[in-house]
Design a protein with these regions (language model features):
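Structured beta->alpha junctions
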Residues: 43-46, 55
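Short hydrophobic/aromatic beta-strand micro-patches
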Residues: 9, 54-56
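Short S/T/G/P-rich N-terminal loop/turn motif that feeds into the first structured element of a domain
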Residues: 1-34, 38, 45-49, 84-95
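An amphipathic, aromatic/His-enriched active-site/gating alpha helix that lines ligand/cofactor pockets
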Residues: 57-84
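Generic structural signal for residues in well-ordered beta-strands
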Residues: 39-42, 78-80
Length: 95
């Protein structure tokens, strides 16, 4: 199944919600998984982006649904990148 990196950056409203309820991060993961994907790992990061998630989804369309649903809430912006395992990448370069 394809994997993706989703980077997210919270806006002021997103930070306010997070300060009120830090467990909201886990709640959002549960909501995201209800859309048909699996959150494999989640990290807080420093810099331009606030969070990095590794997500497995059946296809690009499902992942686009997740990204647009989250962005439509107005509390964050996202960037989603498809990722390829290095072994698969090397095999593709050879083949």
């Amino acid at each position: 199944m394809p994997k993706y990196v989703m980077l997210s950056s919270l806006g002021p409203d997103g930070f306010a919600r997070l300060r009120e309820n830090p467990e909201r991060l886990r709640e959002v993961s549960t909501e995201v998984e209800a859309m048909g994907v699996t959150v494999l790992d989640q990290f807080a990061v420093l810099g331009q982006w606030d969070f990095l998630n590794i997500i497995e989804a059946p296809d690009d369309v499902t992942m686009a649904k997740v990204a647009t649903t989250l962005a439509s809430r107005g509390t964050l912006k996202t960037m989603t990148l498809p990722i390829i395992a290095i072994d698969d990448f090397i095999a593709g370069m050879r083949g």
